[in-house]
Amino acid sequence: MYEYFKGIISKITAKYIVLEVNSIGYILHVANPYAYSGQLHQEAKVYVHQVVREDAELLYGFATEEEKQLFLSLISVSGIGPVSALAIIAADDNAGLVQAIEQKNITYLTKFPKIGKKTAQQMVLDLEGKVVAAGSPAESKAPVQTADNQELEEAMEAMLALGYKAAELKKIKKFFEGTTDTAENYIKSALKMLVK
């Protein structure tokens, strides 16, 4: 088993990043690959978890040790696999997730991707009182109010009309939040990120 890899991020796609360690490129499936865009071609430390299946060996990557622990807690729940766990983490609401589990808020939990009522109930049963530490870093973050960025909204709507998936665009939009640019430049930058 591996704890983390330290290497150069050589590639970013919509679903994974490639981390080059000692001339070997490892595919790491991560919750939000575009969050690593600022580190492209730079050294990064990524926490990892290996999943061995009959047909594949997969590596999942995490920005922090806490994020990795949350992932491990989620996949311990019956009905939640690695892909679903990553989708939940990608929603970027770890504090809300932990709070909903502690308060047994089934309705809130079903708002997360791929989580139905039965799985939400299982999450409460299995994780209540166990995931506070994993969620605490997210809880400590002060909420940031971002002003409406009309240019960014226009760019995302245009790309949606071009046929790009909403899930991919959501990740890209999150990366650009807090910046100011023209819709045209946002589209150009987003296209570069999508083709890498």
UniProtKB/Swiss-Prot annotation:
Residues 147-196 are annotated as: Domain III. This is Holliday junction branch migration complex subunit RuvA. Residues 64-142 are annotated as: Domain II. Residues 143-146 are annotated as: Flexible linker. Its main location: cytoplasm. Gene3D superfamilies: 5' to 3' exonuclease, C-terminal subdomain, DNA helicase RuvA subunit, C-terminal domain, Nucleic acid-binding proteins. One of its GO terms (biological process) is DNA repair. GO terms for molecular function: ATP binding; four-way junction DNA binding; four-way junction helicase activity.
